[in-house]
Amino acid sequence: MEAPTLSQLEGLRYSELQKLAKTAGLKANLKADKLLKVLKAHFYPESKNETLDSDGSSSLTDTDELNSSQEKEEPVSVSFVTHRRGRGRKPIRNQDTPKDEFLTVSAGVGTENMASSIDRTQQQNCTESKKEETTSPIIDNKHRKRSRSEDTSKQNNLESTGKTEKRQKKASNVTSVASTGKIPRLAGRLSKPGSKPSTPNFKKLHEAHFKKMESIDKYMERKQKRLDAVSSSIQEVKMLTKKSNLLKSVEKTPVSDIKKPVKSRLSLLSPLPRTTGASPSRTPMSQRRSCRSSTASKSILVDRSGFKPSVFSSSKMNVRFSEATKDNEHKRSLIKTPARKSSSFLAVTPESEPRRILPSVRKTELLPAPEKADKPDVNITLNTTTQPSPATGMSACKAITPFKFTAQNTETPNTKKKGKFDLQASLSRQLGYQPHKGKLKPWGESKENKPDPNSNVSVLKNNYKQPHLQTREDRRNQHVQNRKNKRDQALGTRRGVPVK
């Protein structure tokens, strides 16, 4: 391949230069100027040296100009070292060193700097007078560099000597305390050259901890005492409850042949209604006596047990407030329902026969007698053992039970047999409700809130997860229905029949 001339190389385009570089085996992905230089250097190596010489001279002149400009700008600055401001740690000044040395050193440095600045000014003047000579600035630069390196080396030597002196003084005067009151840095380590952090004796530490701890025997004794205390308190409570139960059983001793009912089993029949008037059996004097006797018989131990509730569950509580308040007397259905557990109920024991409470007797149903006319309705409790015979009468029945038997003996539900149903009598009896008057509604239209047939409420209710989407078939059916309705309406209007 023939090498192109310099004029030809300069006249070529960028793409042609790239092709040429590729053929020569050079890097073609460069800028046009650099590529041209590379090609020239490759084909004509003599021109390369010339260009380098010219570049060197130009760079020298550039550096000289730069230096001269810097000297013009910074004639005032004494030192050429840029100090870091407050970033690193400040060097520890030894206060024993005299200030005179520091002053002499600084003065020496200052004089040197001043001398160098004077030299520079003289050199500047020389360069202005002799601009044509190229060798003079190179020599000046060399001199400057040497002077700078000498200054820096002197400063470094001074600093290093100062540091070594400081260390020696610290090692000798470890005991002497500084005037400021602070221990100098690393003084402690210098005083103890062979000291190392000693590991603690863990065996001794563990033994000390174990000695502090409580022994297992002592712990077991303490635990046993605590358990005994708890169990004794529980036993005391049990004993108290037993004693109270015994005292209650003593209080319930029978006065006569009729045994008082124990509260173990309660009858499921409704309790007796409380009479407003004072009963003849319970006079004020007798009540006082009973209170005294009950307080006298009660033991001190019973009071210790505290509050004892009569009802142990909310499901068995007496919720019939109408009996006490008398404000719901019209609600007679409440009395018919079976009673719940209450303190006012009569209990039944296995020894005594089960008592029965008679229903309230109407005046009309009783046998007509002039004595009974002004007597109120009474619920009567009968016992088979104490039923008075008609011969003896009222004299045989004494006020043994808390409820005194005042009325005459009537038929109980067991003894009275049910008769046949009399239709005429039931029809003649007055109705307990108001019968409906007027026309009845038709059976089909019994629903008050009839849903609209066109509404989608029922569909939405059924398919709330997957709503019903209107399809083409639905629309087709709707159109068919609309046509049918229109046809019916047209026929109706033609025949004179009103169609909805």
Swiss-Prot record:
Q: Answer whether the UniProt record assigns the keyword DNA-binding to this protein.
A: yes
Compositionally biased region (Basic and acidic residues): 323-332, 442-451
> What are the record keywords, sorted?
Cell cycle, Cell division, Cytoplasm, Cytoskeleton, DNA-binding, Meiosis, Microtubule, Mitosis, Nucleus
Mind listing the GO molecular function terms for this protein?
DNA binding
Biased-composition ranges for Polar residues?
113-127, 276-298, 380-392, 452-469
Subcellular localization, per the record?
Answer: Cytoplasm; Nucleus; Cytoplasm, Cytoskeleton, Spindle
Can you supply one Gene Ontology CC term for this chain's record? Answer: cytoplasm
Mostly located where? cytoplasm
Biased segments, Low complexity type: 264-274
Q: Which InterPro entries match?
A: NuSAP
Q: What processes does the entry annotate via GO biological process terms?
A: establishment of mitotic spindle localization; meiotic cell cycle; mitotic cytokinesis
Spell out the residue ranges making up region: Disordered.
Answer: 48-204, 241-299, 319-353, 365-500
Biased composition annotated in UniProt, kind: Basic residues? 82-92
Describe its function: Microtubule-associated protein with the capacity to bundle and stabilize microtubules. May associate with chromosomes and promote the organization of meiotic or mitotic spindle microtubules around them.
Q: Which family does it belong to?
A: Belongs to the NUSAP family.
Binding partners and assembly:
Interacts with DNA, microtubules, ipo7, kpna2 and kpnb1. Microtubule stabilization is inhibited by ipo7 and kpna2, while microtubule bundling is inhibited by kpnb1. Active GTP-bound ran causes dissociation of ipo7 and kpnb1.
Could you identify this protein by its name? Nucleolar and spindle-associated protein 1
Please report the organism this UniProt entry assigns to the protein: Xenopus tropicalis
What is the gene name?
A: nusap1
